[in-house]
Amino acid sequence: MNLNFYTLCVIYLVYSFLGWVAETVVATAKGRRFTNRGVASGPFCFVYGTAGVLITIGLNDQRASLAALFFGSMIYATVVEWLTAKLLERIHHRRWWDYSDKKFNLDGYVCLQYSLLWGLLGMAAVRWGNDLLFRLCAHLPPLLFHAVVWVGMALAVLDQISAMVVVSRYANRHPRLGQLNRELGRGSERLRQKITASVEKRIQRAYPAAARPEPTTSAEKQLSLADLLWLFVIGAFLGDVVETIFCRITAGVWMSRSSLVWGPFSVVWGLALVLAAILLRGGEQKSESRIFWFGVILGGAYEYVCSAVTELLFGTVFWDYSGFKFNLGGRINLLYCFFWGIAAVTWIRYGYPLVAKGMKAVKRRIRPWMTALLAVFMAVNLVTSALALARYDARTSGAAPANAVDVLLDEHFDNARMERIYPNAKKVEKAG
C-alpha cells in the first residue's frame, strides 16, 4: 500500500463521511427523528477522518498483528477524540459531548465502551478497509481521481471554516474569532444570522452538551498566538538541551539533537509543550499519578506518530529504539514513555507555572516586531529544514539536482553537514 498525499486524502474524506453516516444513523435511531451529526453543513465528522489518517500512518507497519492494530487503534483514536473534545472546549467554552453517564469514562471526554469500538474499527480499516478503498480508487482515471480529491478536500476545508464561523456565538469570549466573524459577516449579516440560527439549532439537537448555558471551567484566560510561539521556541530549545545532556551522560558523546538546520531546536519537544499548555492547563488539581499516566499514553502516541510521519515525509527514521526492551516497531519504548509521564508531571506542576511567570515578567519588554521576527525566522528555518531533508533523501537515492533550489541545497546542506545535524538518522529502503 503506497501512502502519499492523495491516498491519505481519500482516507480522510471517506472515513469522515462514513463516520458522519454512522453517527447520524445512530443518533436518528435513538431520537426517532433525523439528526444530522455534522458540525457544519457538509456530511463529514472529521474526527473519524483524522483518526483514520493517524492510525494508517502510525500502524501501517503493524498490519500483520491484529492485537497491535486493535490496541494501537484504540489508543490513537481515543487520544484523537480526547484532543478534539479538549480543543473544542478550549475554543468554544462548551462541551460538545459528555460521556459522564457511562462507565469507565475519563472526565466525560472519552469512555471505555467507545474506545473498544474505535479499536475494532481501526483494526478493520488498516487490515482490510484501506486496501479495498484503494482498489476501488484504482479504477478511476488518474486525472479524474486527482480532481475528485482536490475538490473533496476544498469542500472539507470550507466546511471546517464555515463551522468555526457558524458556532462563533459559542466562542464570543474569543475576541480574535469574534473579530474575524464580524469581518466575514459584514455586508451579509442578515443572511448569516438566518443560516447561523438554523445550523445552531441543528447542532444543539445533535450535540445537547454544547447547548448548556453555563460555560465550562475552560473559560479561562486564553493563550495568544504570540504566547504559543514563544512557548514553542522555549520548549524546543530546552528539549534540545536536555536531550544533548542526556546523550552525553548515557552515551559519553556530544551529538546534535536538533530537528532544524539552524539553531538548537527540537520540534518534537516544542510542539509537545505547546499541546500540553493548550490541553493540560487547569490540570494542576489532578493527582500526580493521573498526570503521569496521561503523559505516558499521550507522549507515547505522540512520539510514535512523529516517527511515522517523518519517515513518510522524508524517508528517514530519526530515532530507533529497536535495541530497547518493550519497544513498538522501534518507534517508542516503555522506558521513554515513562519519561514522557515524568515530563508531564514536571511541566504541569513546576515547568509551566515557572515559564508563565517568566513570560509575564518579560512580556511588557517584548515588542511586536520581536515576535514577528522570531515567527519569520522559525518559519524559514522549518521550511529550509524540510527542503534540506527531502533533498538529502533524494540525493542519497542517487537523484540528480532537478532545479536551482536543489543545486543550492546541495551546496549548503551536503551529506556531511546533514549527517552532523542528524547523526542518528537512518534512511529507510523503499519496498519495491
Indicate residue ranges for each PLM-predicted region.
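Aromatic-rich, lipid-facing transmembrane alpha helices and their immediate juxtamembrane interface loops
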Residues: M1-G432
